[in-house]
């Protein structure tokens, strides 16, 4: 029996550690029949080392999503490797330390701009860089963290994720005519490298311990990875502009 991504060609960003959603997405995608290519920044060697733990060998290319030269040559590099693309996974987010950890009111605009560029605008710029390879349509899937609420310590990453969610909706509107879907997976907190860089992450994670209807495991990125893979597949052919919550159900619970 073939997998749900059999014959698909997928570009995946953000594979830094085995604890990341991106790594588990890559692993599951290969297991479901996809050919994948990974991007890395700022240390491609780190991603190359982690990539060796995937079921099959895969190429890693350097990509800084804020660098126009990197974006400009992306389609040529990926095209030579895979011939085209059927899916893109955006697993990129960053904010300077002074934009996190309770410093919301004192964060300078330069740091806010960095968070917005890397975490939100890059969804558009990455997709547009890949667009020449998606002649037969495809699926773009990004990762968010529920931007409806003001979370402890999350500060300017909250507005950045809100911008990401709005960007995804507008992309869904504008790319639908090319049969390209754009959706997000909103995952609960995980003990990834990115999460651990947030001051006071434990306070944020404790919300899930007390309120999540389904038991939430901070050490298990696979449920979120499964959500991403499902959206990359043909099982959601008419779903776009959507946010699929993989958070143990916490988004549905009131105070």
Positions of PLM-derived features:
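Canonical Rossmann dinucleotide-binding motif of NAD(H)/NADP(H)-dependent dehydrogenases/reductases
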Residues: 2-38
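Catalytic loop of short-chain dehydrogenase/reductase
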Residues: 14-24, 93-131, 136-177, 189-192, ...
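A short hydrophobic alpha-helix cap/turn motif
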Residues: 30, 83, 134-135, 173-178, ...
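A glycine/serine/threonine-rich, flexible loop-to-helix segment
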Residues: 48, 52, 177, 189-213, ...
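Conserved mid-core segment of classical short-chain dehydrogenase/reductases
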Residues: 51-55, 61-72, 76-80, 87-113, ...
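Short-chain dehydrogenase/reductase
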Residues: 75, 123, 127, 168-169, ...
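C-terminal helical subdomain
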Residues: 121, 184, 203-239, 244-248
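Conserved Rossmann-fold SDR core element
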Residues: 165-196, 236-246
């Amino acid at each position: 029996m073939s997998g749900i991504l059999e014959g698909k060609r997928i570009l995946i960003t953000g594979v830094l550690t085995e604890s990341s959603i991106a790594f588990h997405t890559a692993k599951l995608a290969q297991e479901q029949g996809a050919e994948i290519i990974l991007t890395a920044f700022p240390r491609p060697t780190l991603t190359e080392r982690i990539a060796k733990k995937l079921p099959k060998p895969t190429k890693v290319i350097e990509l800084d999503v804020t660098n126009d030269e990197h974006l400009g040559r992306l389609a040529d590099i990926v095209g030579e490797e895979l011939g085209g693309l059927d899916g893109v996974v955006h697993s990129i987010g960053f904010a300077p330390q002074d934009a996190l950890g309770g410093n919301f009111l004192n964060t300078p605009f330069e740091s806010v701009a960095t968070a917005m560029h890397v975490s939100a605008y890059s969804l558009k710029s990455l997709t547009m860089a890949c667009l020449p390879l998606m002649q037969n349509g495809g699926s773009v899937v990004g990762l968010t963290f529920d931007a409806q609420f003001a979370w402890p310590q999350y500060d300017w990453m909250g507005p950045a994720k809100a911008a990401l969610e709005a960007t995804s909706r507008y992309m869904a509107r504008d790319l639908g005519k090319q049969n390209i879907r754009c959706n997000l997976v909103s995952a609960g907190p995980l003990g990834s490298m990115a999460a651990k860089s947030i001051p006071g992450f434990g306070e944020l994670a404790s919300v899930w311990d007390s309120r999540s209807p389904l038991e939430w495991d901070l050490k298990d990125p696979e449920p979120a990875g499964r959500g991403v893979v499902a959206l990359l597949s043909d099982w959601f052919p008419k779903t776009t502009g959507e946010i699929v919550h993989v958070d143990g159900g916490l988004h549905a619970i009131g105070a």
